[in-house]
Amino acid sequence: MIIPKEILSLVEQVSPESWGEIYPKLFAALVEYGLTRVETELVLRATAKRLGVSYAQVWADWQTYLGHDPKGAKPRASDHLRELLEVEEYEVWRSPGNEVWVSVRLNGHVEHWPVRSARTEAWLRRLYGQVYKRLAPKVAVEDVMADLRATGLLFGDVHPVFTRLGGWKEEETGERRVYLDLGRPDWTVVEVTAEGWRVIPASEAPVRFYRNEYQRPLPVPERGGSLEPLWDLLPLQGERDRLLVLGWLLGSLNPWGPYPVLILSGEKGAGKSTAGEILKRLLDPTKAPRRSEPENEGDIVIAAQNNLVLLYDNLSQISPKISDAFCRLSTGGGFSKRKLYTDDSEVVLEAQRPVILTGIGFGAIRDDLADRTIRVELTRIADEDRVTDSQLWARFHREHPRILGALLDAASVALRRFDETEGELEAVVKGWYP
């Protein structure tokens, strides 16, 4: 949908003072260019917003200009729904990939959803049902969602969308801040700066988080935390492996990447799957955290859109195509995905995510992936040291706030020294090995 530049220019000139002069030119242009109904309504709504009046008033002027009786036509359900939106507090915008989003204030906090989503549809149906006490017609909801999408594409500001972890950089000072969405019902996030960290309402953060139904909440981190409980939970071989795991965890809290791929290997009984799940749950608890080997890039794209940390469990080998995808997740790259509701259009998604791979042996790993990996060999847990799953996870949940607090302390130090440590991933990874 493309609105002619002449019409957009006229809309930009609209004000209460200029309306008497502008509206004949604007309405004549609408007739001349033969805009569709949706395009015309979009222009009229933008005009009403600039005038500070209701859409109904501008629509009546338009009908009068056309020689129609503005009171003659019976309003449709979609018109009723549009009128309800005029008094709602919401914002339509788009992501860098041109996906249109809507931000809605609900119960004292703001949520961000794709316009084409079940949540947006449910919000519109609720607005309609609260007033008219009946179910909104499907066509009315679809019409209004199409309006929202057109508005976002043509007039929406561009904002990045983050899942669980987001980064912000001040243009003038170069100051970097990290935001971690706790995923809690109170809609709080952790703000990490070079001076420390604090828990704040998500509405005070300059980044926009998307929450999905798979995410689970993080605990509120404790100050004065410690990493010692983490080392008690993981069957690591010594100080070297602790430094490697700590480096990977801190790297995972860097929103700008890149991210080394962590490989956890070891003989049967070394607790590889559990160790991988512990590391994922530390930063990104989700429903069903362990994933089997992806069959194609599409599986990886979906996982990257809904997770911060990707845990692929019990792999035996990695195909060349999947190996290449893991490389792109590590250092950044595009993933092609067919655009919804089209036959041949594609959208390219940029994705970088921390990845954990577990397995007894992966066979030969291609050099480009090997250059991006950190390998940690876990020790077999002695029979006398084994505990039940319920005991292990009870310990984890008890210590989780302390461990998370310690990681955030370390992340703050990393921000203070960000410019000193920034460099090529290969050099960083190799530097971690003695």
Task: Indicate where each model-derived feature is located.
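Conserved RecA-like P-loop NTPase ATPase core
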Residues: V43, H112, L249, S273, ...
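Feature primarily recognizes SF3-like P-loop helicase cores of small DNA viruses
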Residues: G257-P260, T286-S292, E297-V309, L315-I322, ...
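P-loop NTPase catalytic core of nucleic-acid-dependent motor ATPases
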Residues: L106, A194-N306, E420, W432
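Structural motif
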Residues: E17-E21, G34-E39, G72-P75, L234-L244, ...
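N-terminal nucleic-acid engagement/recognition segments and initiation subdomains in replication
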Residues: M1-R223, I302, D409, V413-R417
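AAA+ P-loop NTPase catalytic core and its hallmark functional loops
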Residues: R328-S336
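Short coil/turn segments at secondary-structure boundaries
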Residues: L42-R45, R94-G97, L243-G247, I263, ...
